[in-house]
Amino acid sequence: GCIAWTMMEYKEHRFTLHNFESIPEKFDEKTIGDFFFSHHLHHMFANQEYRIVIPLWHICKVIIPTFVVLYFLFGTVVALDFNAGLGLAQLFYDSMHFWFHFGGDFKIKFFQDLKEKHMRHHYRDKTKDFGVTSSFWDYVFDTI
């Protein structure tokens, strides 16, 4: 689940939240529209605390259907294990993202490099550096 999360994070961030062509004509504030605009407000006002973490309802829209599909395909253990990984990765993402914006520098180079990469995404080039918790997919898709 944790590994799958990195791909979901990259895909969502790059192809949904930064793809202006994907904006539906009519938004339902309970669906992607609210999250899409919230993300762009986060870019405009990057240091507002309430725009840093992903809303719980958006997380549930991913975890609940994933659990149901995995439960019917592979059973309870796989569904629980995979979703536990997704949940842990989400907590890691929210914690790291919050720290990137409001914490100091990291003593561990890996985390400091991720923070600097994320700040580049915000302030230099919004078409690069989509991975927040990992640079792996940015290297794979040449967006580093």
Model-predicted segments: where are they?
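Loop-to-helix transition at the N-terminal end of transmembrane alpha-helices
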Residues: G1-T6
